[in-house]
């Protein structure tokens, strides 16, 4: 939206994507080189083994390369390091550097990288490593960043909250339930503070 897509265009983009593919690390056969294709055709099942160190552990179930590629396609023309305040509509997004526990607000840089970092849900997507930072979804520190919008000059804040309510103990059964609850709890105080700054909710 910030770079000129209309609401109708964004709706169409969302509805026409193959989300099963985007939210996987599968590489299309057409993108593989000849030797990779031959390996695929030779074996019904393959299990990769490698010497892996602690530093190489990815930190998430999904590397997110396919969705990052989509972001790159959608932001064609904005691949250089740019000032997000100079976009057709000023833009910012929030991540957390888990190396320091600090909030990182992107006002500049590569748009696709900022988008990918701000959606790196811990345990689901691998963190984004950038300039000695290890970045995850900003929802862990600021899931309703009204303060960021105010600092950018917003006069009226219209907020929409799509997060789930906290679950009672008998509903916290799966790993996903527990991770989701932790993320909601981590940003709860800042959320309450920002909620009071909202004009329409």
What are these regions (language model features)?
Residues 2-201:
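Patatin-like phospholipase
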């Amino acid at each position: 939206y910030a770079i000129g897509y209309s609401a109708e265009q964004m709706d169409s983009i969302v509805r026409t994507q193959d989300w099963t593919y985007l939210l996987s690390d599968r590489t299309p056969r057409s993108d593989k080189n000849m030797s990779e294709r031959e390996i695929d055709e030779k074996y019904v099942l393959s299990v990769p083994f490698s010497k892996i160190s602690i530093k190489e552990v990815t930190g998430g179930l999904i590397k997110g390369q396919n969705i990052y590629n989509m972001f790159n396609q959608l932001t064609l023309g904005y691949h250089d390091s740019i000032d997000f305040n100079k976009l057709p509509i000023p833009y910012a997004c929030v991540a957390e550097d888990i190396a320091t526990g600090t909030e990182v607000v992107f006002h500049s840089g590569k748009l696709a990288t900022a988008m990918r970092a701000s959606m790196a849900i811990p345990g689901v997507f691998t963190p984004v490593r950038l300039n000695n930072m290890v970045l995850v979804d900003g929802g862990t520190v600021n899931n309703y960043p009204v303060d960021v919008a105010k600092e950018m000059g917003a006069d009226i804040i219209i907020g929409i909250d799509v997060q789930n309510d906290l679950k009672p103990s008998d509903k916290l059964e799966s790993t996903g339930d527990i991770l989701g609850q932790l993320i909601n709890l981590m940003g709860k105080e800042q959320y309450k503070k920002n909620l009071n700054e909202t004009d329409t909710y």
